[in-house]
Amino acid sequence: MRHLISSLLLTISLLASAASVSDTALLAFPEALGYGAYATGGRGGVVYYVTRLDDALNSDGTPAEGTLRWALTTGDDTPRTVLFQVCGTIYLRSKLKLQHPNITIAGQTAPGGGICIAGANIYICKPNVIIRHIRFRAGDIPTSNYPALDVENARNIIIDHCSFTWSMEECLTLYDTDSTTVQWCIIGEGLYNSKHKKGSRAYATQWGGEHGTMCYCLISNCLNRTPRFNGVRDEADLANGKHNHDAQVDNVFYNNVIFNWGKKNSLYGGENDSTKNHAADGSQLGYNRVYMLHNYFRAGPATLAANLSERYFVQGSKAGDYGQWYLEGNMFEPNNKFNPQKKAWHADTLAKVNADNLYGYASGYAYRAFNLDGALANADNYTKYVLDSAQWAAINIRDSILSGEEAYRMVTTSAGATLPRMDEQDTRMLAEAAGTIDPLFVGKTAPSNLGIIDSQDDILFTREDYFYINDSTVMGGYPFLDALEGDSLALDTDGDGMPDLYETEMGLNALDPVDGAMPSEQGYTHLENYLNGVANGSIDKTRYETEPYTSQQPDAPTELESIRQTNHNAMSNTRYDLQGRPLQNPLPKQIYIENGQSKMQQ
């Protein structure tokens, strides 16, 4: 699997370099795409190593050295690169708000299985940030409704190969931003009937910002907001020279896979609240334009259970006015066993809207795949709210865009935090979306909605991480990321972020703490060349990991381990129908689930 992923990443690198527009600026990394592709992060700055998994504080309330909180908040605005000498789950006891700009967080450098951030969230509110290969799994242990990651009031952000799951709010929140990219991520399995004060959720992402790109992401196992396009908000007053919130919005959403949603309008939003965005002559200053291209929609058991008589690629919302939309090449998977038995889902109907995403809007066709909430489907509104191909071409996107089918194959093998190795959670979610297994896990609230969970405790793993949530309490229930037998740690004597053996191999000085920040012939710093090589598979970092690694995870409490084992034994070899109900005697030819596998009774 690792060699397959590496090969795919090298292919993606070639796609990224075959841009339609020649760029002189250096990309964040060679595979960077979209509006956030030119973030510089910690380039040329200092290195901070995370050396412990806890979220401890000193007696004066400052973060303990070696913690993630310390690495992200201490010091000044000098660019920094955060690397990891630990592996496992880091439970944040409170929100971690960035205090400085110009940060790279390189999860691919961790030993063992890598890094997961649980509990409270990281709040990105500073510019110029690169995040790669980190899992953000908030969970329901905290009492607050945290999104797994919150990005607001920031610009020049790129998030690559990360995973966002198990949030009581959206799994990823990103708006009031400019020049951002979310690429090759897994977003989903939001918690449904959890502890949120507003009740049931199961939301994937509220996403937008001015000049935002989302591409090659899997959005899965959520009833709604897959995504919710944030749109233009009411607060901006461009006529008075203010620009504090999203007001002139271009969002590009392409080559994503949406699986197992539960609402006809699970993609919606994109409002243009223009009530304050007018010049003195009354002309509109603010706008919202969403470009949706070649995304792949695959129904799942929650879609089937909803029995939807309508289904949309997107439904635009109104707040003052509707935004404008460009749709091209999006497709619903035909002949899927989870497609509801409704006219809107018949193969001939899907063929029409797959061939022309705007089919029937001007004529009011009942089974159209684009809709505006509350607006008539007619020729006038088509002309007003639909962008044409010339307007799409005018924004001059440099990215190479694949067909929906090609994107589906690549996303379902390569999205998420794949390094240092893929965990059990991401492996399952990719397999579900790819159709090699059917969703099995379900919460107690809606047992017919397979794949929709109430708590991370609804998921069973063959092996788990354990971590402290306070000074004395140990919890588990998260996928195993600790080191396996044979996993080691790289020695970095000078602390410049590069292993000693690598520096020697490259003709650098393993005792010079400055050479990592120096630019190479390629333009990237020597440290960036190492990080980029590890990420795209051209560098095997295990060749340089020669030092023994000692686990920092606490032992599992005896009573907790006993409960987990009892639940696992109860689940094993039990058969379930497609509504998640235990099944004693399947009927002939009946499809059922056993140990996460779809089977048919003979």
Q: Where are the regions a protein language model picked out?
A:
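Acidic Gly/Asp/Thr-rich repetitive segments characteristic of extracellular carbohydrate-active
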Residues: L27-T81, D577-Q584
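Right-handed parallel beta-helix
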Residues: N102, A106-G107, P127-A138, N153-W166, ...
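Residue-level detector of functionally pivotal "anchor" positions at catalytic/ligand-binding pockets or at interdomain
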Residues: Q552-Q579
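Extracellular beta-strand/beta-solenoid scaffold signature
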Residues: I117-I122, P142-D150, W166-L174, K195-G209, ...
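Extracellular calcium-associated, cysteine-rich motifs in secreted modular proteins
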Residues: M475-A556
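Extracellular beta-rich repeat passengers
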Residues: R228, V252-T473
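C-terminal tail/sorting-segment detector
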Residues: I591-Q602
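Extracellular beta-strand-rich solenoid/capping regions of secreted or surface-exposed proteins
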Residues: A64-D76, I90-T104, G114-R132, A138-R155, ...
